[in-house]
């Protein structure tokens, strides 16, 4: 297990917990990529990634992540969590997984997978047979 990756995972989670976007972005490489699978096209580069994160925090200012497990590997970590946020006055919760590639002690890529059908059900939206 890489101590460097483990420390990054801890600090990254702490920065997200307090919505410190500057601290989050300081842990990303210049050519970082963020992909919210099923939600948007990948954001490539520091500026685009920051914009994507800022948009999420603006849409869900009370977003919280309760970590369930973190798996540390060589050059990556995987974070399993429960996300909660308020959308149009409704509290929504769903499971999520982040797969984070690390290069030089910083986040090179963040792939986020959320339980979109659970979010859609809680918002009263129809779910497709493919995403269910």
Spell out what each predicted region is.
Residues 111-132:
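Low-complexity, intrinsically disordered terminal/linker segments enriched in charged
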Residues 64-65, 92-98:
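Short, surface-exposed coil-to-beta transition loops
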Residues 3, 18-74:
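A solvent-exposed, acidic/Ser-Thr-rich amphipathic alpha-helical stretch
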Residues 12, 24-25, 32, 45, ...:
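Hydrophobic pocket/interface hotspot
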Residues 28, 83-85, 114:
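Short beta-strand segments enriched in hydrophobic/aromatic residues
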Residues 74-83:
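A short hydrophobic beta-strand element
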Residues 59, 84-93:
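Short, cysteine-centered beta-strand-loop-beta hairpins and adjacent loop/turn segments enriched
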């Amino acid at each position: 297990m890489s101590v460097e990756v483990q420390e990054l995972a801890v600090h990254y989670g702490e920065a997200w917990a307090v919505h410190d976007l500057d601290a989050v972005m300081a842990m990303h490489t210049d050519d970082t990529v963020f992909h919210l699978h099923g939600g948007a096209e990948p954001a490539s580069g520091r500026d685009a990634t920051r914009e994507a994160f800022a948009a999420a925090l603006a849409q869900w200012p009370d977003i919280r992540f309760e970590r369930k497990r973190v798996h540390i590997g060589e050059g990556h970590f995987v974070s399993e969590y429960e996300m909660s946020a308020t959308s149009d006055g409704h509290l929504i919760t769903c499971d999520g997984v982040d797969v984070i590639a690390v290069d030089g002690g910083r986040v090179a890529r963040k792939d986020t997978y959320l339980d979109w059908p659970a979010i859609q059900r809680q918002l009263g939206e129809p779910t497709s047979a493919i995403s269910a």
